[in-house]
Amino acid sequence: MAPTTTASRRIDLSDPPEPYLSFWRERRVCTLTTLRPDGTPHVVPVGVTYDPEAKVARVLARRTSRKVAHVLAAADAEGPGARVAVCQFEGRNWATLEGLARIRTEPAEIAEAERRYEERYGRRPSPNPDRVLIEISLTKALGKV
């Protein structure tokens, strides 16, 4: 388990501290928050991978899921992407990544996301022809780890 600090804080996306990175490498269920068309939050459990070098978080999803529909609707309305957040916690430790999401359908991008998922969660996702990638370009990181 990652060492604990005493204060929550904004994390520098250009230079996240090792305890924060370690916390994102550990296996745990996360949440993804998207916004419904009426602006209310839709929060669902997901697996997330974090690529600090690219400043990207990735979530695999089914093409027909509500989270994908929310991202598509918001991205169309807002331009470059839908505002989303992914979060994970254990005890008093927590980490949140915020950013702009878009849906990726390219097989190579999905395969890379599956590889990263397997690396973090220890198993390859089962085959799914309806799989898409929610790719989040990160704008903010917060946490207490």
PLM ranges: what are they?
Residues 2-15, 91-145:
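Charged, gly/pro-rich active-site loop segments
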Residues 2-34:
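Short, conserved active-site entrance elements at the starts or edges of catalytic domains
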Residues 21-22, 87, 124-126:
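Short secondary-structure boundary/capping segments
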Residues 27-63, 84-87, 97:
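Short beta-strand segments
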Residues 76, 80-86:
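A short, hydrophobic beta-strand micro-motif
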